[in-house]
């Protein structure tokens, strides 16, 4: 899956940057600090920022007053914690948007497949090229009154049964405006269909990462044909073209050519004493010839082919007059042994798992999430058809529908694995199985913040919950625990090294850690703002990640000050008579957070 490589590349970039920042913080930062921070008294009298400092002092006082109440009352603390967690989970379930696979990106290229009516010659198909070129020509010659984008490149290729075309614009941001321009000339021709889309950065076909494939499988084409026509009509009614959706059939139902069919008559063959194999070989001799053997000639193997002198000049009408030698040595004509007819047949035959298949390709408009469309197709088309089908015809979904299912399973597994690794790491560092559970409660709260941020962004612009956006939740699981770690570790420090009681240690840790928590969080939030606000190439790919991390980090930072103190107090009362929680070894002389 393309999403796997994307996840890996982003994960490597983040991991390397974190490792480098840690190395810099323990080597370069202390050296620079020793040179620039020589007079500690200078930092005791810092200028006040009128409004910000007043708000910050008031907020700190509010948090400490709240902390004094909840750490002294077990029931109040449990009520607050339960309310926060329950409300977060409810919001997470209710506001969880439908899933999407991958964004198409903003690639500067539109591509269209054109299906023409049966019987169109290549020359007739070229008329579509002329009509498209007539529409596109003003867009590459000079400015046009309708202010459509200028075309930088344009091509058209025609063949028997169809054609395809493509174009690119000088302004990559306006490439979508060419889709109706190129599709309009084709839509005016009776029986012709155009499937014009912007090329996807990740899609493997014309449908891109939003293309749903409905495979109609059956034993033969005669059985599949009425089924796929029914399904195509149902899909067209659910997702009409006027709403921006596009539907095409593969292989094209119009891509047919005349075919000469010879059906042997078993009774006539038996009377003449000719087997079906001998009859077929006789036809091959007059058609392309049959290979007798390969003989060496001049150091090479040369094919010895049995054919006739009239092979190149024979006409279709002459097939019935081809002589076949009967068992008694007499000559019998093909027309006496078989029925010869000219019929229409598809140019392409597709099979899946050994069965004939016709694929209906649905390209969704950007306004409908992929998960919503899949659910609607399954409930209204696939499931009812498969239940009622009695002739061996089945429907299967593939394409982006299958990719989304596999990617979603992988993302869920990655989130669980990430949380498990974080938990085990915290167990080793804190020497406790309970304290890491307190820290990890920030993860679902942060996920709620990410969903709320995504909902707010959708009020301004469309941003689906695609798999790239889901990567933001995986990143959150490793980022939002930092603030909780600061508070828990600082509380343990006050208990073990300053001899404080649990209540005083919790309140002191809350007071000490508010400033570094908000310093680190605000720098991260402002660093994410350009990713969310500013447009540009690639912004549609990573805007979802930015808003999820932004919303999750903001909400978890605000709420961590409200549920960590009561949880710590409850846990410490529970183990009051036991060995201190998180008994760190004496080798740790000072917590890393003390330097924050």
Question: What are these model-derived regions, one by one?
Answer:
Residues 228, 232-418, 427, 503-505:
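Extracytoplasmic/periplasmic membrane-proximal domains and adjacent transmembrane bundles
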Residues 6-25, 85-87, 105-112, 192, ...:
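Small-residue-enriched core segments of transmembrane alpha-helices in multipass membrane transport
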Residues 2-15, 59-75, 98, 232, ...:
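Alpha-helical membrane-interface segments at transmembrane helix boundaries
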Residues 16, 424-512, 518-534, 551, ...:
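Hydrophobic transmembrane alpha-helices and their membrane-interface caps
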Residues 47-101, 511, 591-593:
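Signature of alpha-helical transmembrane segments and their immediate interfacial
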Residues 94, 124-208, 233, 267-285:
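Solvent-exposed, membrane-proximal periplasmic/extracellular interface segments of envelope transport
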Residues 1-6, 78, 82-120, 197, ...:
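Transmembrane helices with small-residue packing motifs
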Residues 5-49, 165, 483, 518, ...:
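Transmembrane alpha-helices and their membrane-interface boundaries in multi-pass membrane transporters
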């Amino acid at each position: 899956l393309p999403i796997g490589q994307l996840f890996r590349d982003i994960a490597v970039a983040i991991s390397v940057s974190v490792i480098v920042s840690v190395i810099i913080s323990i080597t370069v930062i202390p050296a620079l600090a020793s040179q620039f921070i020589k007079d500690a008294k200078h930092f005791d009298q810092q200028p006040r920022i009128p409004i910000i400092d007043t708000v910050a002092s008031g907020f700190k006082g509010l948090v400490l007053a709240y902390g004094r109440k909840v750490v002294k009352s077990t029931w109040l603390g449990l009520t607050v914690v339960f309310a926060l967690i329950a409300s977060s989970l409810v919001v997470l379930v209710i506001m969880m948007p439908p899933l999407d696979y991958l964004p198409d990106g903003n690639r500067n290229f539109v591509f269209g497949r054109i299906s023409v009516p049966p019987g169109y010659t290549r020359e007739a198909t070229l008329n579509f090229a002329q009509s498209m070129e007539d529409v596109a020509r003003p867009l590459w010659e000079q400015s046009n009154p309708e202010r459509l984008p200028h075309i930088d490149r344009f091509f058209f290729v025609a063949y028997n049964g169809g054609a395809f075309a493509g174009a690119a614009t000088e302004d990559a941001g306006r490439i979508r405006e060419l889709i109706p321009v190129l599709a309009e000339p084709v839509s005016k021709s009776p029986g012709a269909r155009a499937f014009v889309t912007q090329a996807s950065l990740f899609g493997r076909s014309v449908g891109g990462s939003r293309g749903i494939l409905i495979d109609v499988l059956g034993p033969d084409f005669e059985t599949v044909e009425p089924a796929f026509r029914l399904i195509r009509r149902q899909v067209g009614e659910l997702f009409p073209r006027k709403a921006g959706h596009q539907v095409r059939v593969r292989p094209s139902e119009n891509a047919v050519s005349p075919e000469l069919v010879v059906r042997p008559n078993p009774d006539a063959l038996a009377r003449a004493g000719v087997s079906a194999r001998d009859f077929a070989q006789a036809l091959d001799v007059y058609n392309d010839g049959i290979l007798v053997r390969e003989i060496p000639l001049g150091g090479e193997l040369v094919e010895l082919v049995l054919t006739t002198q009239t092979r190149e000049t024979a006409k279709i009408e002459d097939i019935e007059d081809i002589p076949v030698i009967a068992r008694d040595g007499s000559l019998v004509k093909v027309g006496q042994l078989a029925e010869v007819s000219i019929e229409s047949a598809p140019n392409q035959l597709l099979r899946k798992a050994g069965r004939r298949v016709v694929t209906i390709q649905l390209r969704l408009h950007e306004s409908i999430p992929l998960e919503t469309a899949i659910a609607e197709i399954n409930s209204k088309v696939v499931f009812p058809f498969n239940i009622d089908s009695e002739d061996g015809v089945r429907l299967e979904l593939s394409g982006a529908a299958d990719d989304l299912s596999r990617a979603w399973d992988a993302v869920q597994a990655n989130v669980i694995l990430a949380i498990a690794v974080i938990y085990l790491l915290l167990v080793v560092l804190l020497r406790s199985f309970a304290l890491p559970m307190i820290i990890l409660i920030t993860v679902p709260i942060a996920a709620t913040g990410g969903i709320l941020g995504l909902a707010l962004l959708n009020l301004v612009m469309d941003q689906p919950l695609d798999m790239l956006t889901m990567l933001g939740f995986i990143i959150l699981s490793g980022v939002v625990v930092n603030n909780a770690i600061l508070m828990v570790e600082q509380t343990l420090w006050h208990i073990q090294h300053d001899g404080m009681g649990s209540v005083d240690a919790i309140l002191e840790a809350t007071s000490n850690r508010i400033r570094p928590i908000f310093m680190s969080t605000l720098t991260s939030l402002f660093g994410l703002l350009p990713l969310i606000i500013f447009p540009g190439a690639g912004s549609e790919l990573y805007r979802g990640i930015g808003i999820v991390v932004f919303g999750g980090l903001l909400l978890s930072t605000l709420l961590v000050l409200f549920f960590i103190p009561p949880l710590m107090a409850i846990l410490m009362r529970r183990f009051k008579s036991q060995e201190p929680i998180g008994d760190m070894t004496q080798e740790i002389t000072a917590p890393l957070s003390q330097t924050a």
